[in-house]
């Protein structure tokens, strides 16, 4: 059985997230998703929703077999526990594939790293970014 692993913040779930997870699921027989803990999200604004709520929403998706929160201090701990065959990165995630492969190798984790394709909006006004959703909320409600 091929284990695929996706990871991300998944704050304010949107069609871009669904596209990413569906594509990741097609790369394996079983999809694990690591949802970043709020305290570990340092490369962008803090999530709006609590990590447990984001994990529960991701776990409720039919395409996801297992959803879990990331480790509090070492992002590789759940990867070691899951032992995936492939890690699938989102098309716009800031991670560098080569650096991840090196770090995995240094820890004795043998798995590939692939990047999911982008998704274009299906219609005018479709928002595929949490930041854009927040901006729209502020435009209309603040």
UniProtKB/Swiss-Prot annotation:
InterPro entries xref list: Archaeal_FAD_synthase (IPR050385), Cyt_trans-like (IPR004821), FAD_synth_RibL (IPR024902), Rossmann-like_a/b/a_fold (IPR014729)
UniProt-listed Enzyme Commission number(s): 2.7.7.2
GO biological process, one term: FMN metabolic process
GO molecular function annotations of the record: ATP binding; FMN adenylyltransferase activity
Pathway entry: Cofactor biosynthesis; FAD biosynthesis; FAD from FMN: step 1/1
Domain of life: Archaea
Record keywords, A-Z: ATP-binding, FAD, Flavoprotein, FMN, Nucleotide-binding, Nucleotidyltransferase, Transferase
Cofactor(s) needed for function: a divalent metal cation
Binding site for ATP: 9-10, 14-17, 92
Reaction it catalyzes: FMN + ATP + H(+) = FAD + diphosphate
Keyword check for Flavoprotein: yes
Keyword Transferase: yes
Pfam families in the cross-refs: CTP_transf_like
Family, similarity comment: Belongs to the archaeal FAD synthase family.
Its job: Catalyzes the transfer of the AMP portion of ATP to flavin mononucleotide (FMN) to produce flavin adenine dinucleotide (FAD) coenzyme.
Subunit structure of this chain's protein: Homodimer.
UniProt xrefs under PANTHER family: FAD SYNTHASE (PTHR43793:SF1)
Protein name, per record: FAD synthase
